[in-house]
């Protein structure tokens, strides 16, 4: 379990979700089951890259199947490794349901759970499907490429204090909310689970900031590739927007 899962940020700006739906853990997924709430399990550190990819695709299949069946699913994650895995699965699920001319969007919110005597804070991605808007052949990469506002998430140092970590997440949340206020949408780029987790928490907090003006914040993740020091690296970008732009 990621020690950064419980950072106390659920008290800042974002509405906390109380789970009322029947929850299925990742290990209990059946291929034909429509799931209301899915708890993502972090992979073990010694897992092979092939097994890691297989696990993400299994999650993506469960998410997309449930979206087709009931239109919505809660994807619950605790810790950066779990959040990163969940976000990647959601990104793949978006491409899966796109074949049926459906689009996937989500809203992250803070959640809590008890593990023994400890209360852990995590992220729930309220993920939903709707009929795709605009031209059916529009690629996500084209939508992302047209967005002029781009934020790059920087990983925090490993020795950073818990308080400084919270401050950095709130700063990022403020930047996201400001970008939304200025241009109604922004792209948040992440490389590595630590930055994906940081961005997810920041978006959840930014929802609270945007809500003050009477709007809500939504997003969808997509894979990106960048050249870093001569090596190709795959990351995640969140396309973030508010219903003010609708």
Feature locations, PLM:
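Long, polar low-complexity intrinsically disordered regions
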Residues: 1-25, 30
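Short hydrophobic/aromatic-enriched beta-strand-loop microsegments
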Residues: 96-101, 208-214
